[in-house]
Regions:
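Beta-strand-turn-beta hairpins that frame and shape the catalytic cleft
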Residues: 57-65, 218-227, 269-270
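A glycine-rich, aromatic-flanked flexible loop/lid motif
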Residues: 164-169, 215-216, 220-221
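Basic, amphipathic N-terminal segments that precede the first structured/catalytic domain
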Residues: 1-107, 296-299, 303-322
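Conserved beta-sheet core of the metallophosphoesterase superfamily
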Residues: 173, 185-189, 196-203, 208, ...
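Short, motif-level signal for alpha-helix interfacial/capping segments enriched in acidic residues
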Residues: 45-53, 96, 148, 234-245
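Short active-site segment of divalent metal-dependent hydrolases/proteases
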Residues: 73, 122, 261
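Core catalytic region of metal-dependent phosphoesterases/phosphodiesterases
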Residues: 51-68, 79-197
Length: 322
């Protein structure tokens, strides 16, 4: 009898535990439903009058800043990563012009600022540079001047207000030893004067030959103060400080070449934009284990400053066969 009573009590406890567990599930469900009811009762459905009165943006018009940096005209490259010669240079510039046409149309650009950011020629400053060259330095200058003039003339088809600014790069030094070089005595400094004569009959194109210094310059694009340099004497991290101290006023945008790859960073509120190269990966870059496609940068400027930046690829990456 005692064992039966003990067994009965055990079963009663089991039943109570099961009932408690079941009730807990019911309580959780009830609480969840209560929370849903509370939320539903607290929410007021949207009414069209509740939305903000959005004022439609009216475009202020746009300028384009079209970079043309590090062509390295005269170089001959034939590697697994890149092929480059005069004909390929022409093809890449044609690709660039076509893409700029689309950008002009997309943003209804009213004016184009073309920045020649240096190293338009390959020069003869290093032994490996001289080995790569297919043309001597004078031929390189003439070829680059004609190709860049054609580039600007083609842009004129879609925009009749074009200003051209230029700075020389380190590859156009007259003397290979940079300690012997006189600032401003670079070979590619001749290119803007060639362009000025070549383009003189196209009203609306102005090739600027006066600048603050042979190594950097500046201009206004709508309301923005824009500075530019080749990049061999400055880095993206210090160029804002350097040039701000030189001009004694805040700078909105700085454009650099030299490093052969597109990029953008912000330093103290100033946008530093780097434009890549047209020549593509050379033996020097391969030695550093760096490889990228030929590329240039195009900036769209409105009255408020930089609106957008285009990463323009001039060619697809090479397929490496191992």
């Amino acid at each position: 009898v005692a064992n039966d009573i003990q067994r009965l009590k055990i079963e009663q406890i089991k039943i109570r535990d099961e009932r408690a567990a079941t009730n807990k599930v019911y309580r959780d469900i009830a609480r969840a439903e209560s929370i849903k009811d509370i939320i539903a009762s607290a929410i007021v459905p949207y009414d069209k009058n509740d939305f903000l009165n959005i004022v439609q943006y009216e475009g202020s018009g746009h300028d384009l800043i079209v970079c043309l940096s590090d062509l390295h005209t005269g170089a001959g490259i034939d590697s697994a990563w890149n092929k480059f010669d005069k004909e390929i240079l022409k093809a890449r510039l044609e690709s660039y012009v076509t893409q700029v046409f689309n950008i002009v149309e997309r943003h209804a650009a009213e004016k184009i600022h073309v920045l020649l950011l240096g190293d338009l020629i390959n020069g003869h400053i290093h032994i490996n540079t001289r080995v790569q060259n297919n043309e001597n330095s004078i031929e390189q200058v003439m070829t680059a001047a004609e190709l860049v003039s054609n580039f600007v003339a083609e842009l004129y088809e879609v925009c009749q207000h074009i200003d051209v600014y230029s700075v020389s790069g380190n590859h156009s030094r007259v003397f290979p030893n940079k300690d012997e070089q006189v600032v401003g005595d670079e070979l590619e400094a001749l290119i803007p004067f060639y362009m000025k004569a070549r383009l003189q009959n196209l009203a609306g194109i102005e090739v600027k030959t006066d600048k603050l210094d042979p190594t950097f310059g500046g201009f206004k694009a709508r309301n923005s103060l824009v500075m530019y340099a080749h990049g061999d004497k400055d880095s993206p991290s210090n160029v804002v400080e350097h040039l701000t101290m030189m001009v004694k006023q805040p700078i909105d945008l700085v454009f650099l070449g030299h490093r052969h790859t597109n990029g953008m960073t912000t330093v103290h509120g100033t946008k530093v934009i780097e434009s890549g190269c047209v020549c593509g990966t050379d033996s020097f870059a391969v030695g550093l284990r760096k490889n990228d496609v030929p590329q240039q940068a195009v900036a769209v400027i409105d009255d408020g400053g930089l609106e957008c930046l285009y990463d323009v690829k001039l060619e697809k990456p090479a397929k490496i066969v191992i």
